[in-house]
Every structure is written in structure tokens, then in C-alpha cells.
Amino acid sequence: MNYLLVFVGGGLGATVRHAVNMICARAFGTHFPFGTFLINVSGSVVMGLIAGYLAFRGSAAQPWRLFVMTGVLGGYTTFSAFSLDTALLYERGEIGLAALYAIGSVVLAVVGLFAGLALVRHLT
């Protein structure tokens, strides 16, 4: 049942992500990735609201967390999970590790993308 909750939530999140990208492309053009920018920021805000509420006001049932946080927000943007992981490291006082995680994730993700592009160019 848990996998089904994540699956359905992920489908909803991905659908909203696509809609936001299309709306932003029509409204602002495609010269800057406004859609992705908005998705990453808004997903992180929503993740912070939910995580903060659960931490300070009480816990929610595991199925609800799986559906909303892993499913919907995971399908909408993985940046929200990245932001939460960074904040949790920082909140635990592991500031250096939080910085290493944040910088390393961004740098290595971009380097990985370029490596994938270069490999495909080389093979084709």
C-alpha cells in the first residue's frame, strides 16, 4: 500500500510540475528556466512548511507523509528533499557537513550532467 501512495502522489506531483513548466514557458518564454526555478523554490517552501509543522505541532501518519512528502513533492521536485536534508544537517549543528552536502550535490550533479552529455556526444 505504501508504494501505491508514493506512486499516486508522484504522478500528481509530476503532473503539477509539467503544468507549472508549461505555464511559465508561455508567460515568460524559454530563455531562462523560470518554471524549474519556481518549482524548486516553491517545493522547498512547501517541504519546509510540512516538515516544520510535523516537527513542532505533532506527527502525521506515515501513509500521509509518504503520499505528500515522498510522492507529491518528490514528483514535483527533488530539490525540496535536498533542501530539507541540508537544513537537517545544519539544524543538528553539522554546518560544515551541510555546506559540503549542498555544494557537493550541486557541483557534482552539474558535472555529472556534462559528463553524460559528453559521453553521448562521443558515442554518437
From Swiss-Prot:
Q: What is this protein called?
A: Fluoride-specific ion channel FluC 2
Q: Which GO terms describe its biological process?
A: cellular detoxification of fluoride
MF term (GO), any: metal ion binding
Membrane-spanning parts: 36-56, 66-86, 100-120
List the residue ranges forming a coiled coil, or say none. none
Taxonomy, top ranks, is: Bacteria, Pseudomonadati, Pseudomonadota, Alphaproteobacteria, Hyphomicrobiales
State the NCBIfam families in the record.
Answer: crcB, PRK14195.1, PRK14198.1
Q: Which family does it belong to?
A: Belongs to the fluoride channel Fluc/FEX (TC 1.A.43) family.
Q: Pfam families, alphabetically?
A: CRCB
Q: Which organism is it from?
A: Nitrobacter hamburgensis (strain DSM 10229 / NCIMB 13809 / X14)
Q: Which domain of life is it from?
A: Bacteria
